UniProtKB/Swiss-Prot annotation:
Quaternary data: Has multiple subunits with at least A(3), B(3), C, D, E, F, H, I and proteolipid K(x).
Phylogenetic classification of the source organism: Archaea, Methanobacteriati, Thermoplasmatota, Thermoplasmata, Thermoplasmatales
Subcellular compartments: Cell membrane
The name this protein goes by in its record: A-type ATP synthase subunit D
Keyword annotations from UniProtKB, A to Z: ATP synthesis, Cell membrane, Hydrogen ion transport, Ion transport, Membrane, Transport
Length: 209
């Protein structure tokens, strides 16, 4: 590492140390915010997963009940009238991390809310509601799992950058500043000694006169 022992270089190096420390503080704050967001989503998704098994069992029970009460033919007929669903992918930004958001929409079909209220038996209606709710919850869990994955990648990246600044860049700059200061001090001492010697010679010359 080439060191230029000048006062300007010392000022620049000290300025770089200050900026590096400021950047390190910002990275640590960012990492703390990302970890907080990660833990919040983890708690939410844990609760959603715990409820998911019960929701699956409830949905299967309602479809069995509907089949017993209305028959398989009626179920299949209404199932064929159901609309396709579309998942739209959007995103939100959390401390510079792009988090995908998934929005579920149902396309228009014969099986409208009005038609269901008038023509679809209650047991089948209940089964439709349960499965739509279950599907929506699955989409939300998938969205949050993607968010956790992206946050984890960014947390790791931020940690590596922080470590590089804290353990490599700042110590290197501090060593550089220390060496420049030592070299400047040494130069000043040499200059002072030289001037002192010159002064003595001048004074000695005067005495000889």
């Amino acid at each position: 590492m080439e060191i230029r022992p000048t006062r300007i270089e010392l000022i620049r190096t000290r300025r770089r140390i200050k900026l590096a420390r400021k950047g390190l503080d910002l990275l640590k704050m960012k990492r703390s915010a990302l970890i907080y967001e990660f833990l919040q989503i983890s708690r939410t998704i844990r609760g959603m997963r715990e409820n998911l098994r019960r929701e699956v069992e409830d949905a299967l029970n309602t479809i069995r009940t509907a089949e017993i009460l209305e028959g398989q033919v009626a179920l299949e007929r209404i199932a064929n009238m159901s609309s396709d669903s579309t998942i739209n992918v959007d995103s939100r930004n959390v401390m510079g991390v792009v988090i995908p958001t998934l929005n579920l929409t149902y396309n228009l079909s014969i099986l409208s809310d009005v038609y269901r209220t008038i023509s679809v038996p209650v047991a089948i209606n209940d089964a439709i509601d349960r499965f739509q709710r279950l599907f929506l919850n699955l989409i939300q869990i998938l969205e949050k799992e993607n968010a956790l994955r992206n946050l984890l990648i960014e947390i790791d990246k931020t940690k590596r950058r922080s470590n590089a600044i804290e353990n490599i860049l700042i110590p290197r700059l501090e060593y550089q500043a220390k060496m420049i200061k030592m070299m400047l001090d040494e130069r000043e001492r040499d200059t002072f000694t030289t001037l002192k010697t010159i002064k003595k010679k001048i004074e000695a010359g005067k005495d000889e006169e």
